[in-house]
Amino acid sequence: MKRQIDYSLYLVTSSSLIAPGSTIERQVEEGILGGVTLVQHREKDISTKCFVERAKRLSEICKKYDVPFLINDRIDVALAVGADGVHIGQDDMDCALARKILGDDAIIGVSTNNIEEIEKAAADGADYVGIGSIYETNTKDVKDRLIGITGLRKILEHVSKMHCQLGTVAIAGLNSSNIQRVIYLSEANGKRIDGIALVSAIMCSITPRETAKELRNLIATPPCFAQARSSLTTPKDLLNQIPAALQKLKDFTPLIHHLTNAVAKNFSANVTLAAYGSPTMGESYDEVADFAKAPGALVLNIGILENTKTYIHAAQVNNDLARPVILDPVAVGATTARSKVINTLLNYAYYDIIKGNEGEIMNLAGEQGLMRGVDSISQHTLAARITAVHRLAVERRCVVAMSGAVDVISDGNSTYVIKNGNPLLGQITASGCSLGSVMGVTASICQNDKLLAAITATLLYNIASELAVEAKNSCGDLLVQGPGTFIPIFVDKLHQLINETIKGNVDWIERAKLEKAE
């Protein structure tokens, strides 16, 4: 009878990566004692005789602890040593033939990279599939098979709908720094990856038992940045919580670290100050860890593409400290290079709030979104925008905010539209970028409810624009005559709204046009 398999911590051996002074046998046994649940023995450039001898020793260790032992590729070696099964690649023996040779009780896994390979493996009788490559790895060249978290999630979404039991294991480039992110962000339709396959993390460790324990704990524990869905389920509930949230700014000034484009820096800094935040625009890779130590948030407004390494590092550092990260994927879809960079960012870090205009969000949601430079060209119905925002929020397990004449905001559970604002916001440079700054402030004070944070920021921003165009001088004349006069009055009104709220005057909230999308 075929045994039940725990794929959680899947160790792939490598005799070329053994920690100094250790042996492959010691690394495997210590790894098992620390929590390894399955061992796959892989050898390269070694004689069959040596392969069999080493495999026998490892097989005995695995039997001692009742841990399944698989052989990579070699059906003959698996038979010779009495292994529990094999793992085969796309260029190895066909899975159906391997099943015929090894029998129904053998454990057979297949390396896969796409849905077609998944379907074939299942049809051929595979027990599980190794899915990847998730990231690049030093153990082999996988550049032509990289799928990232985005690709892994699409595959798991497909597997969740298959009418068969098929184990899933993520492979390539995985270690203690990224496995929680991969597990959390790849989950689809309730289907979570069954296991994480690692090589160097354990084989290179001088303390493999402790390393395996740490890895098992990480696999079983949600990441610190995991986002709970809002408990507020109606517009009234949300609006009632805004005053209490903004009151926190009376005694707390969050540091809002911006990695933004040059044209937005000045305005974003002024808006951050008006919103009771403290702006910093440091762009050095070496500074981001120090900035993240201060309570606040990170705003990634994608400007210079050459700063990708810094963007990723900054997001990951803030993820590790559970600091909110706001991503503004500026002009994604406008150029191939920009889309590639933003896709990389999505695969290497978590973002609490993704905000953008219609074109940007529709592109990320997999829909056609027209861009004219950094500007969006509206072409979708409100219903289509609501659907796209909700879907993207579900996929990325975050809050998504689409700005426009009507704003759409969702946490994947509840979706809302906001019908406040003035068209002059669209006629000044960096108005969208600076909304991200306000979201950074509100996310810092709404740590447990990023939906409330995004809605609060958007209402503040939009209502401030309405009040600005209504402002009059002592003679009764309108102060705002166009985009140029709008900017300073808008910044003033934004500051006044928060200041009045702190004092207890919340009449402005009555202007909110917040509706729940059906």
Swiss-Prot record:
Cofactor(s) needed: Mg(2+)
Record's GO cellular component terms: cytoplasm; cytosol
Chain sites annotated for binding 5-(2-hydroxyethyl)-4-methylthiazole: M281, A430
UniProt keyword annotations, A-Z: ATP-binding, Kinase, Magnesium, Metal-binding, Multifunctional enzyme, Nucleotide-binding, Thiamine biosynthesis, Transferase
GO term, biological process aspect, one: thiamine diphosphate biosynthetic process
Binding site for 2-[(2R,5Z)-2-carboxy-4-methylthiazol-5(2H)-ylidene]ethyl phosphate: T137, N138, T139, G173, V199, S200
Induction cue: Repressed by thiamine and 5-(2-hydroxyethyl)-4-methylthiazole.
Cofactor note: Binds 1 Mg(2+) ion per subunit.
Top-level taxon: Eukaryota
Binding-site residues, ATP: K355, S403
Amino acids binding 4-amino-2-methyl-5-(diphosphooxymethyl)pyrimidine: Q40, H41, R42, E43, K44, N72, S111, K140
List of catalytic residues: C433 (proton acceptor)
Record carries keyword Transmembrane: no
Pathway noted in the entry: Cofactor biosynthesis; thiamine diphosphate biosynthesis; 4-methyl-5-(2-phosphoethyl)-thiazole from 5-(2-hydroxyethyl)-4-methylthiazole: step 1/1; Cofactor biosynthesis; thiamine diphosphate biosynthesis; thiamine phosphate from 4-amino-2-methyl-5-diphosphomethylpyrimidine and 4-methyl-5-(2-phosphoethyl)-thiazole: step 1/1
A Gene Ontology molecular function term of the record: thiamine-phosphate diphosphorylase activity
Annotated residues for binding of Mg(2+): D73, D92
Signal peptide: none
EC number from the UniProt entry: 2.5.1.3, 2.7.1.50
Catalysed reaction equations from the record: 2-[(2R,5Z)-2-carboxy-4-methylthiazol-5(2H)-ylidene]ethyl phosphate + 4-amino-2-methyl-5-(diphosphooxymethyl)pyrimidine + 2 H(+) = thiamine phosphate + CO2 + diphosphate; 2-(2-carboxy-4-methylthiazol-5-yl)ethyl phosphate + 4-amino-2-methyl-5-(diphosphooxymethyl)pyrimidine + 2 H(+) = thiamine phosphate + CO2 + diphosphate; 4-methyl-5-(2-phosphooxyethyl)-thiazole + 4-amino-2-methyl-5-(diphosphooxymethyl)pyrimidine + H(+) = thiamine phosphate + diphosphate; 5-(2-hydroxyethyl)-4-methylthiazole + ATP = 4-methyl-5-(2-phosphooxyethyl)-thiazole + ADP + H(+)
SUPFAM superfamilies: Ribokinase-like, Thiamin phosphate synthase
Region of interest called Thiamine-phosphate synthase, as start-end residue ranges on this chain: 1-229
Region annotation (Hydroxyethylthiazole kinase) ranges: 230-518
Annotated HAMAP family: Thz_kinase, TMP_synthase
Family to which this protein belongs: In the N-terminal section; belongs to the thiamine-phosphate synthase family.
Function according to Swiss-Prot or TrEMBL: Condenses 4-methyl-5-(beta-hydroxyethyl)thiazole monophosphate (THZ-P) and 2-methyl-4-amino-5-hydroxymethyl pyrimidine pyrophosphate (HMP-PP) to form thiamine monophosphate (TMP).
Protein name: Probable thiamine biosynthetic bifunctional enzyme
Annotated source species: Schizosaccharomyces pombe (strain 972 / ATCC 24843) (Fission yeast)
Gene: thi4
